Swiss-Prot record:
Coiled-coil stretches noted in the UniProt entry, renumbered to this chain: none
Matches recorded under PROSITE patterns: C_TYPE_LECTIN_1, C_TYPE_LECTIN_2
Miscellaneous: Shows greater sequence similarity to the alpha than beta subunits compared to other heterodimer snaclecs.
Tissues expressing this chain: Expressed by the venom gland.
Protein name: Snaclec A9
Domain C-type lectin: 11-132
Lineage: Eukaryota, Metazoa, Chordata, Craniata, Vertebrata
Swiss-Prot/TrEMBL keywords: Disulfide bond, Hemostasis impairing toxin, Secreted, Toxin
GO-annotated cellular components: extracellular region
Length: 133
């Protein structure tokens, strides 16, 4: 689609791909940056984009596990566990849809909410992830 690499999906000027690999948040972000110059874990800037990403994840992750989460490019950066004011790609947060704030610092999408709500997760846990370029 529209100048995306093979296997990537186009939406409003960006390309997206769900990876069925288990990585920590940090390793997933690093992996995404290695896919292309502008690659990062997905940043979700609107409800429409959230729906697109949720559908993409649902289509690409068929088998279920006890814990089904998918990393997005958001994590708390300071010691007080508040969320950082930007996505991992540097864009500002102007759309939010998380469940409840906990002490866990990285955010992911949860299968139980059909990948539409954001949940706080332990950054060191390996989960699958979505990259955006």
């Amino acid at each position: 689609d529209q100048d995306c690499l093979p296997g990537w999906s186009f939406y409003e000027g960006h390309c997206y791909k769900v990876f069925n690999l288990d990585k920590t948040w940090e390793d997933a972000e690093k992996f995404c940056t290695e896919q292309a110059n502008s690659g990062h874990l997905v940043s979700i800037d609107s409800k429409k984009e959230a729906n697109f990403v949720a559908e993409l994840v649902s289509q690409n992750i068929k088998e279920t596990r006890r814990t089904d989460f998918v990393w997005i490019g958001l994590r708390a950066e300071d010691k007080r566990q508040h969320c950082s004011s930007e996505w991992s790609d540097g864009s500002s947060i102007n759309y939010q849809n998380w469940i409840e704030a906990e002490s866990k610092k990285c955010l992911g999408l949860e299968k139980q909410t059909r990948y539409r709500k954001w949940v706080n997760l332990n950054c060191g846990q390996p989960y699958r992830f979505t990259c955006e370029i």
